[in-house]
Amino acid sequence: MTELTGKRALVTGSKSGIGFAIAKRLVQAGAEIILHARSDSAEVEEAKMKLAKLTTQGVSIALGDFSDPKSCRSIFEKIKKDNKPIDILVNNAAIQPVCALADMSSSDISQMLEINLQIPIMMTRYFAEYSEKGGSILNICSIEGLTPALNHSHYASSKAGLINFTKASALELGSKNIRVNSICPGLIERQNLDKDWPQGVKSWLEKAPLKRLGAGNDIANAALFLVSDAASFITGANLVVDGGMECVPSW
């Protein structure tokens, strides 16, 4: 029931990292994929080439700079013009700067809330507007939306907002046969993570019940389930994929 043959999916922020892992998993399940990136680059073309080797469905690219909210409508207008509506939307694109509250400017806050919260809201709105037969929306949130980390107050707030927006939009869009769910990833392995944040990685490995970092595939497998017909009676849900870290007592 996790087969996606005949489905078309748009994954934002999908040239690398979690977004690419999700796009790859959906392709492997039979979906036709639209990769999204801010601008064209060798990395985007390489991502497209890697996915194209896995499918005969074709892989396309949607470019849109999310610092401009108008790009959301532009992406969906192009999809409509191509006369190939999408069935699945994964709102993955986000930013995660580290900044102490005392050093935070109003522009820092505005940028964070615009890209991490306003853009997924607008993408959801246009998905619903252009949808012909319903579908599935998945918001990639963070465990920081549940338990914040030091110097991440604006990031944690944006993700907490997205978790609640998931529930609110699921309530509103159910009558249109649109399901909306979210995933809260834990610490996911990436290149140079142990060099960029050695103490954080060390602490995670000591505390996490499964004693490992997450991988992109861990999030991708959860994403596949939630956007597929296997989850046809699930909407407004938030799935925590963190190796059990949420269970660790803080006392």
Tell me what each language-model feature is.
Residues 3, 147, 224, 235-251:
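Short C-terminal tail/terminal secondary-structure segment
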Residues 8, 15-16:
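Conserved glycine-rich cofactor-binding loop
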Residues 100-101, 108-113, 193, 204:
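Substrate-binding pocket helix/loop in short-chain dehydrogenase/reductase
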Residues 124, 158, 166:
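Active-site helix of classical SDR
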Residues 129-130, 171-172, 232:
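Alpha-helical segment proximal to the catalytic Tyr-Lys
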Residues 142:
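Residue(s) in the substrate-gating loop at a strand-loop-helix junction
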Residues 174, 179, 234-236:
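Short, small/polar-rich loop/turn modules that mediate ligand/substrate recognition or access, typified
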